[in-house]
């Protein structure tokens, strides 16, 4: 297949309509926001030619303008208040929208090598540029049929749970032509209220942030030419088989797949049996905090669990045992831990805190990091032409970073996108579907 050329045909800043209330209000980042990646996260969805023909760019943009009025942080900008704190300025400045044309057919691109031009399918935001929009969208139409909606949002605005709600609400706004839709819970101060006096009980400076003792300092680098992006499809029958392996213990799809991936990637890496390996697991804290935070809270509410095992134990253990290690680690992110983290945020309010997000080229080996969008309801992402035919993963060159998303092709199936050292790829391919 010939190289696909993507040409930007239009660029504009789209303001909320109607403008949201706020009048330039300054909202400080919570400690959860400060722990999130200080950068833009791309998300891309594709619709085939028939679905794309039913969607006009104007309708998509009108829906975006309508939904932005209910998500004012995405339409705002970063600023600094009189106390020197990084804040959101809720000023209705708007989102950047690009329209683009790609030569060729989307179906051909998906069947062959869309990865070769995937980084041209979303806006290239610059987090260091003054007044940079916090949400940027690109509508790319293929000349022979097909549409890709690529969006980047700054991670300190919202986590994956929040952005999944935003995307489905945007689709609903287009599909219903502006019918009244609910506003999410937006009160950041209510979800990060410290005790008086604050009493942090854990080493948050070195766990959630890049303190001098942080494990993030120990990871090496890998030449980018050795990074390989992989996509592994787990059909629903395979997922059911994994759950059966766990037996009577209650096991989520995510826990089963993570146990499997952890085992197989560790085996493919051919690590020393005496070495230890851990996984950094994102944990949604909305239902774990005390009191619980509304599920529709728009912002960041994620901390991390760190299941850890010796390689020999991981490879020899049953699936049920590995799931148990994962479940126990996640359970430690409880109400007490979350309140301690909030209290730490108050104690360190004036400190410079660097999140632990990895840079491109980082090699997590012998460890992994995982994020899950399995709960994302792709079937609800219907702008009027039906749900997307594909989720397109960005090129994220970090060895050992995994992302689970629900399959667009098979209900109950899951796609695993990951980057891995090229030297370990063939070994993983040979064993990735083995449950031995």
UniProtKB/Swiss-Prot annotation:
Gene Ontology molecular-function annotations: acyltransferase activity, transferring groups other than amino-acyl groups; hydroxycinnamoyltransferase activity
SUPFAM superfamilies: CoA-dependent acyltransferases (SSF52777)
EC number of this enzyme: 2.3.1.-
Pfam families: Transferase (PF02458)
Keyword terms of this UniProt record: Acyltransferase, Transferase
Transferase found in the keyword field: yes
Keyword match Magnesium: no
Coiled-coil features, chain-numbered ranges: none
Active site as annotated: 155 (proton acceptor), 382 (proton acceptor)
Free-text function comment from the UniProt entry: Hydroxycinnamoyl transferase that catalyzes the transfer of an acyl from p-coumaryol-CoA to tryptamine, to produce coumaroyl tryptamine. Serotonin, tyramine, and to a lesser extent agmatine, serve as acyl acceptors in vitro. Can use caffeoyl-CoA, and to a lesser extent benzoyl-CoA, as acyl donors.
PANTHER family attached to this UniProt entry: TRICHOTHECENE 3-O-ACETYLTRANSFERASE, TRYPTAMINE HYDROXYCINNAMOYLTRANSFERASE 1
Membership in a protein family: Belongs to the plant acyltransferase family.
Protein name: Tryptamine hydroxycinnamoyltransferase 1
Gene from which this protein is expressed: THT1
